[in-house]
From Swiss-Prot:
This is Ribonuclease Y. Endoribonuclease that initiates mRNA decay. NCBIfam families: HDIG, RNase_Y. It comes from Listeria monocytogenes serovar 1/2a (strain ATCC BAA-679 / EGD-e). GO terms for cellular component: plasma membrane. It is a single-pass membrane protein. The chain crosses the membrane at residues 5-25. The keyword DNA repair does not apply. Residues 76-127 are annotated as: Disordered. Signal peptide: none annotated. Residues 336-429 form the HD domain. Belongs to the RNase Y family. The gene is rny.
């Protein structure tokens, strides 16, 4: 019984619990549903608001896009209308231009037609005149042949000869002008090269004299030099070939002689005798012999020094010694060795400017006057002797030709030979390089003017520039332009044949024509 009550009680409690639980669940579910409905309503409300906002934004964007598109379309349409208007204007302008051109062409066609008619008429008139002119010319030719007794061919030959003479004259003038232009250009280039050479070559020159002075310690030494009955001075003069001048000059003896080597030997020997104090014929002979050996050695050293100075090697020793003798030779007061060194340097510089062999040019310049060292001992000109020496010692053919042609005796066969001749003239002809006696100088000037004035048509001549130029004034009525060139050549040839002079002489012929009228 108890168990049944217990079971019933349990069932009751279970039923009550289920009922209460269902009520609680229902209440909770209703609350959740209410909350869910509220949330759903909020979501729906928010969605509606958002949709409304989105709708407004979309409408706004659509309006803006519509406005932008409308603006673009309007702008495009406006631009197209403008282009269309411009195109229409251009077409109108072209039409107007075409109308004007059409009008102009019509006028031109009318003008051309009128000109063609005029030309046709003129051509017809010209043909008629040509026909008449031909008849007149034929009649004139017939009349001329009758009057002059010349046929047409003979008259034609005379006219052709006259034309040929005129053409020959004009050709000569053109050739002369071309020669003058070529000379001017070559002179400019040559002067440029020579100026560069002169700037790079500087040489000192001292005028050579024919006397030497030996200083004495006192005047008593003069008597000892003279010796008893003059035997000492006679011995010294006999051995050296030099004149001793003993005068009132205090403490000095003058040695006079044209051979510088002998004069140098006498000077050295006398200085040694004065220094030694023992002066008698035997001692004089001994000192002269020593002095001669010293001078020979000095000559060899001078020759070697000259070759070293210009950088020339492999010259024969005998030729070097002969070269050294040029130290004691002069030409118009100019020392020949110094002149040869200067020519060597100038020739080397000129060769360098023209791209020639500088060493060979220097060698030819150094040896160009080698014949002057012994021309007073051997018969022949210094050019001939120089060629013989160069050939004997097997010098280069260019060197031999340079020696032979530097005075124009032989034709130059190389550029170096021409350069050596130019350097020789440049060294010798510059002011102060060479000197002459006053008498010879005046005689040469007078001879220059005499030669110039010996020709017909010469009005007056003047020797200027220390005799290095002669200017001849001619009569314009007697001498024409072409004859003046021939006169200058003739005078130049006579000067070369009849005068001896250093360097060169410029011959200038001046022809002046004046036309004077007086207005009243």
């Amino acid at each position: 019984m108890t168990i049944a009550i217990t079971i019933i009680s349990s069932l009751l409690f279970l039923i009550v619990g289920l009922v209460v639980g269902s009520l609680i669940f229902k209440s909770s579910t209703e609350k959740k549903l209410a909350a869910a409905r509220g949330t759903a309503e909020l979501i729906v409300e928010d969605a509606k608001k958002e949709a409304e906002t989105t709708k407004k934004e979309a409408l706004l964007e659509a309006k803006e896009e519509n406005h932008r598109l409308r603006t673009e379309i309007e702008n495009e349409l406006r631009g197209r209308r403008t282009e269309t208007q411009k195109a229409e204007n251009r077409l109108l302008q072209r039409e107007e231009n075409l109308d004007r051109k059409d009008t102009s062409l019509s006028k031109r066609e009318a003008t051309l037609e009128r000109k063609e008619e005029s030309i046709s008429k003129r051509q017809q008139q010209i043909e008629e005149k040509e026909s008449k002119l031909a008849e007149m010319i034929q009649a004139e030719q017939t009349e001329l042949e009758r009057i002059s007794a010349l046929s047409k061919e003979e008259a034609k030959s005379i006219i052709l000869n006259q034309v040929e003479e005129e053409l020959t004259h004009d050709t000569a003038i053109m050739v002369k002008e071309s020669e003058n232009r070529a000379k001017e250009e070559s002179d400019k280039k040559a002067k440029n090269i020579l100026s560069l050479a002169i700037q790079r070559c500087a040489a000192d020159h001292v005028a050579e004299t024919t006397v030497s002075v030996v200083t004495l310690p006192n005047d008593e030494m003069k008597g000892r030099i003279i010796g008893r009955e003059g035997r000492n001075i006679r011995t010294l003069e006999t051995l050296t070939g030099i004149d001793l001048i003993i005068d009132d000059t205090p403490e000095a003896v003058i040695l006079s002689g044209f051979d510088p080597i002998r004069r140098e030997i006498a000077r050295i020997a006398l200085e040694k005798l004065v220094q030694d104090g023992r002066i008698h014929p035997a001692r004089i002979e001994e000192m002269v012999d020593k002095a001669r050996k010293e001078v020979d050695e000095h000559i060899r050293e001078v020759g070697e020094q000259a070759t070293f100075e210009v950088g020339i090697h492999s010259i024969h020793p005998d030729l070097i010694k002969i070269l050294g003798r040029l130290r004691y030779r002069t030409s118009y007061g100019q020392n020949v060795l110094n002149h040869s060194l200067e020519v060597s340097k100038l020739a080397g510089i000129l060769a360098g400017e023209l791209g020639e062999d500088v060493t060979l040019a220097k060698r030819a310049g150094l040896l160009h006057d080698i014949g002057k060292a012994i021309d007073h001992e051997i018969e022949g000109s210094h050019v001939e002797i120089g060629v013989e020496l160069a050939t004997k010692y097997k010098e280069n053919d260019v060197v031999i030709n340079s020696i032979a042609s530097h005075h124009g005796d032989t034709e130059a066969t190389s550029v170096i030979a021409v350069l050596v001749a130019a350097a020789d003239a440049l060294s010798a002809a510059r002011p102060g390089a060479r000197s002459e006696t006053l008498e010879n100088y005046i005689r040469r000037l007078e001879k220059l003017e005499e030669i110039s004035e010996s020709y017909d048509g010469v009005e007056k001549s003047y020797a200027i520039q220390a005799g290095r130029e002669v200017r001849i004034i001619v009569e314009p009525d007697t001498i024409d332009d072409l004859s003046s060139y021939r006169l200058a050549r003739d005078i130049r040839k006579r000067i070369e044949e009849e005068l001896d002079y250093p360097g060169h002489i410029k011959v200038t012929v001046i022809r002046e024509t004046r036309a004077v009228e007086y207005a009243k």
